[in-house]
Amino acid sequence: METLLHSEILKKYKEETNEYIKKKNVEKLFDIILKNVLINKPDNIYLYIYNNIYSFLLNKIFIMGPPVLKITSMLSSHISEFFNYYHISLPILIQQYKLNKGESSNNKIIVNDEIISFILKENIHNLDSKKKKGYIVEGYPNNNLQAYSCLKYLPSHVFVLYADEEYIYKKYEEENDIAIFSYTQKKDYDINEPHEINNIDVKPLKDQVLSYIRNISDMLTILGTNKKVLNLHDFNDQMLIDHVKNEVSKNKDEWDSTLNGDI
């Protein structure tokens, strides 16, 4: 009789414990804590966890897309406003850094990956993780080194907005109400080849676009299963916003039961 009673008590205890573990997301919580500790290797592990536990649970969203186009900024703004998340615009932060360093037309400031990493880390560190449930990083990552660094933040989502050269140039012209290229059919490759038609220096534009095209394949490999590739040919602006909203909504409340007091 005692053995049977003990068995029933033990069974009930296991059921309640498993239910608690599932409801409070305990396994994922400890997995995230462990990963953050191993990535950052703090001297005082207890203080590190105590001071940063809320930041571990933020919905961390990175959005990178074609240079010179407005789509990445527009999407980041809409998502941050809709979910009331922090919005970190890396292009703006880099521009502010250059201005603070006294950049001018005769004095160009080079911002390397180390500086970009520092700027981003500092801004994320300064967020009040108790006030909002997540943040959006606009315009990151942009190359292989940045992709590796991005993974260290244990991102919830990395949205990669993909477009080919022709799309980027045509969209740029549309957004800026300007015609700087003509598109003629190239028979050998059956693609449209842009040719300059105005006396405008488009070299900086072309350099940025070519850098994006050159880096994106390797970045996608590095990001692995963490990224979601969205081909801009398949979306208009509103469709893109709605799609990303739906993706972010899937896990926006996943830590509510962990942080709430009810059992």
From Swiss-Prot:
Broad class of where this protein is predominantly found: cytoplasm
Gene3D superfamilies: P-loop containing nucleotide triphosphate hydrolases
Superkingdom assignment: Eukaryota
InterPro entries named among the record's database cross-references: P-loop_NTPase
Keyword annotations of the record: Cytoplasm
Localization of this protein: Cytoplasm
GO-annotated molecular function: adenylate kinase activity; nucleoside triphosphate adenylate kinase activity
GO CC, one annotated term: cytoplasm
Segments traversing the membrane: none
GO biological process: AMP metabolic process; nucleoside triphosphate biosynthetic process
Record bears the keyword Cytoplasm: yes
Function, in words: Lacks adenylate kinase activity.
Family: Belongs to the adenylate kinase family.
The name this protein goes by in its record: Inactive adenylate kinase
